[in-house]
Amino acid sequence: MQRQSWQIVVMVAAQGLALAGPVRGQADAGLTKMLVESYDLLEAGKLAEAQKIYEQILQQDPGNPLALNNLGAIKVKENRFPEALAYLSQALDRAQGYKLKVNRVCDMQGLCLAFRPLEAVYGNQDLAPLVQLNLSLVKAKLAEEKK
């Protein structure tokens, strides 16, 4: 009887997970290492080197929302706001359900935040609200410049 109860619990749990859909996070430890390395370059002001790594990440994991967000932050630092907006919009489209553990945050001119993941594959922070904040700040800056 107890064995049957455990089977039912396992089946119910499996169905619940299937209905919830997959929890997306950093794809693997190799990508996480690249995300950490590129963030460190970004924070050190080596934007071209950081951008190159983010582009490599996107070749391996097209649409990676953290890479797209941080590319948007680079474009903010370069005062290329329309490009930043494009990257952030792409990031937001893909950020729903993407979880990470943020280790550090880099402020780009008070307009955009870049995020350094903890060296772990999954986390508990939803990326979407963070990207939405960046998108709102860049849109406000563009609107201000048009005045």
Q: Residue locations for each model-derived region?
A:
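Canonical tetratricopeptide repeat
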Residues: 70, 104-105, 134
